[in-house]
């Protein structure tokens, strides 16, 4: 009985979100000039080789997923197909695309060389991180539009006033993804892009860990804003939290409207979308937006003649400044998970899908 009620509730949420997605996709076919900044969780993009010291055995040919070269090639093709579809939809490739759940630089090199997206000439920023499974974050960028000045991997630490559930001994053993920061130039303006994959949800636990990750990203952002007045910053990633959770609102200072922003706050274009019922993934029977991109005041509001955030969807008097990219081929078409992202594995079986997340993006321009 409980299972049936959950399934019924899930179907209701799916119908609502499909209606919303239909509106978004129909309304956002043509976007204005400018640069596209996006994020995509690639859902376990592993190669077929063991990385020393990492627990990647599940994604080996003799592992539990029987992760063969054919499956890996299929996965690469699928990821490139989505990136190409976004480019076809928008009339151009992303300038910046943050990614998560990638095993190493090698898989990104294989991805950007796929024929579907090779003409974008994406370049890569990546650092090997301490995650026990070996999953990292990375950044793809177009060198004709973005010039890298600096990049670094920011480690996760517990040096905070947050009260953690983990004991000091457990904190010593804790490993998660580093945060990637890439600073550079678009036209004559300085930017910094942060790519995050905050600690996963483990039942009701982990809120403090994600709050700390958000706090780290915020603290480094503020340092950059003070060091480089006027710098434009975007913090993106799989936050494993919704836009209205404490990690985003309290620790990353995410605000729903630009009018609410202080000089060191961030505008979260996905907060109003989340409240309106949109989702980038289905988690425990509910639609969530974990794939979030926040921008600082300099990027949100801008100045005359300079790049700033642009609306992607307008409905009556309301404008949405973020977009969740969804297409039928990326969506489960039947079965109990109909209407949700079409993932690589389902119930332990390889189904050859794309990702359990939809990609998200924003647009910056001058109009």
For each predicted feature, which ranges?
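Bacterial Sec-dependent N-terminal signal peptides
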Residues: 1-32
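N-terminal, active-site-proximal structural segment of metallo-dependent hydrolase catalytic domains
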Residues: 27-115, 121, 125-137, 320-323, ...
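Metal-dependent phosphoester-hydrolase catalytic domains
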Residues: 29, 222-233, 241-367
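Beta-strand-turn-beta hairpins that frame and shape the catalytic cleft
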Residues: 30-37, 46, 145-147, 174-200, ...
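Active-site metal-binding loops of divalent metal-dependent hydrolases
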Residues: 42, 102, 198, 238-239
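Metal-dependent phosphoester/phosphodiester hydrolase catalytic core
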Residues: 53, 186-219
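Structured beta-strand-rich core segments of catalytic domains in phosphoester-bond hydrolases
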Residues: 102-190
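Active-site environment of divalent metal-dependent phosphoester hydrolases
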Residues: 104-106, 132, 201-203, 240-246
């Amino acid at each position: 009985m409980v299972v049936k009620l959950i399934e019924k509730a899930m179907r209701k949420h799916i119908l609502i979100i499909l209606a919303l997605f239909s509106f978004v996709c129909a309304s956002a076919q043509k976007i204005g000039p400018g640069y596209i900044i996006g994020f995509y969780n690639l859902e376990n993009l592993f190669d077929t080789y063991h990385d020393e010291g990492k627990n990647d055995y599940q994604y080996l040919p003799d592992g539990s997923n029987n992760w063969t070269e054919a499956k890996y090639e299929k996965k690469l093709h699928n990821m490139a197909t989505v990136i190409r579809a976004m480019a076809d939809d928008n009339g151009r490739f992303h300038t910046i695309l943050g990614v998560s759940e990638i095993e190493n630089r090698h898989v990104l090199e294989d991805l950007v060389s796929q024929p579907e997206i090779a003409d974008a000439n994406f370049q890569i920023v990546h650092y090997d991180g301490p995650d026990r499974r070996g999953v990292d974050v990375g950044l793809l960028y177009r060198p004709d539009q973005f010039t890298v000045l600096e990049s670094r991997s920011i480690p996760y630490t517990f040096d905070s006033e947050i009260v953690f559930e983990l004991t000091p001994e457990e904190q010593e053993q804790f490993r998660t993804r580093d945060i990637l920061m890439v600073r550079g130039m678009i036209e004559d303006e300085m930017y910094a892009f942060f790519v995050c994959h905050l600690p996963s949800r483990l039942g009701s636990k982990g809120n403090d860990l994600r709050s700390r990750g958000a706090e780290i990203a915020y603290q480094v952002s503020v340092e950059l804003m003070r060091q480089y007045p006027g710098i434009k910053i975007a913090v993106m990633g799989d936050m494993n939290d919704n836009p209205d959770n404490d990690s985003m609102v309290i620790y990353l200072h995410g605000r729903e409207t630009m009018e609410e922003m202080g000089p060191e706050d961030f505008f979260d274009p996905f907060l109003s979308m989340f409240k309106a019922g949109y989702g980038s993934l289905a988690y425990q029977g509910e639609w969530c937006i974990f794939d979030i991109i926040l921008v600082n005041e300099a990027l949100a509001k801008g100045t005359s003649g300079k790049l700033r955030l642009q609306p992607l969807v307008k409905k009556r008097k309301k404008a949405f400044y973020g977009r969740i990219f969804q297409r039928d081929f990326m969506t489960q078409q039947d079965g109990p998970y109909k209407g949700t992202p079409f993932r690589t594995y389902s119930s332990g079986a390889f189904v050859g899908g794309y990702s359990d997340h939809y990609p998200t993006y924003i647009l910056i321009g001058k109009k």
